[in-house]
């Protein structure tokens, strides 16, 4: 089961007729969550395992080399086995369930990392970026990538229905405000299409409505062909939001750039002298 405090989600292991209580500090949710009562050990193990994964599977790990990644995963496996040894009262059936979850997590995370690794190789820094031409501009007319030649271009690929995309909007607005007089353009490209909206006309209307209601800043573009747009296909975009940074000469800086909410993006901008 899961429970929610309005900001974070916690997991809880329950059986019929269980009596269980927990305490926590909402400012340090996982770090302070502690269970007492029936099946307290099962629940405390879940929390400890979650913290273990947070410690080893950091955002920086996804930018590491394959050797560094595999070395960290080996350390995580050792730490996981050590954690199990501290909960010796738990039965084998419970650990079998947790082991299966752990293995599934490993497979999914490794697959995600390998995908990002292949992307880094395929879209190497300094190679010429794919381009787009004549996308509809919310402010009027059409816009092409070549219009931004001479400036860095930070591209946000998003859609109106995408929850994680909308989470990044406030951070993106702050970035645009902070760097409005710098040598960089912020460009948002909507991939809204008929697959979600029913018709392209409805998708287009949804895009215009959200841009207006959310008072989205930067350059707001609509592909007109959604996920089938050449630029989206050329960059092998399979999930959103996706962020891309291109240099003033039209070359790739990062084909899978940090999100606006990540401190790593500011560091990258500073390194580039933006």
Residue ranges and their predicted role:
Residues 64, 72-76, 80, 84-90, ...:
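Domain-scale detector for complete catalytic domains at protein termini or as standalone homologs
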Residues 144-166, 172, 185:
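Short active-site neighborhood of thiol/selenol oxidoreductases, capturing the structured segment around
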Residues 167-214, 225-233, 267:
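Structural microenvironment flanking redox-active thiols in thiol-disulfide oxidoreductases
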């Amino acid at each position: 089961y899961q429970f929610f405090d309005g900001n974070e989600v916690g997991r809880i292991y329950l059986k019929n007729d269980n009596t269980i209580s927990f305490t926590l500090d909402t400012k340090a949710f996982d770090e302070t969550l502690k269970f007492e009562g029936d099946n307290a050990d099962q629940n405390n193990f879940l929390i400890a395992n979650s913290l273990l994964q947070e410690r080893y599977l950091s955002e920086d790990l996804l930018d590491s080399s394959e050797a560094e990644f595999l070395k960290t995963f080996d350390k995580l496996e050792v730490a996981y086995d050590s954690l199990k040894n501290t909960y010796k009262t738990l039965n084998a059936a419970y650990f079998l369930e947790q082991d299966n979850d752990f293995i599934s997590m490993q497979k999914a995370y490794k697959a995600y990392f390998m995908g990002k690794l292949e992307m880094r190789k395929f879209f190497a820094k300094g190679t010429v970026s794919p381009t787009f031409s004549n996308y509809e501009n919310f402010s009027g007319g059409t816009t092409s990538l070549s219009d931004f030649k001479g400036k860095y271009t930070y591209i946000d690929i998003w859609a109106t229905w995408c929850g994680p995309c909308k989470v990044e909007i406030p951070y993106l607005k702050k970035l645009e405000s902070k760097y409005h007089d710098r040598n960089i353009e912020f460009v948002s490209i909507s991939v809204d299409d008929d697959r979600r909206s029913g018709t392209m006309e409805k998708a287009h209307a949804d895009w215009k409505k959200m841009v207006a209601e959310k008072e989205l800043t930067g350059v707001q573009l609509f592909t007109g062909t959604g996920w089938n747009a050449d630029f989206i296909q050329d960059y092998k975009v399979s999930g959103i939001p996706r962020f891309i940074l291109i240099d003033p000469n039209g070359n790739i800086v990062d084909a899978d750039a940090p999100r606006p909410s990540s401190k790593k993006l500011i560091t990258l901008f500073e390194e580039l002298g933006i």
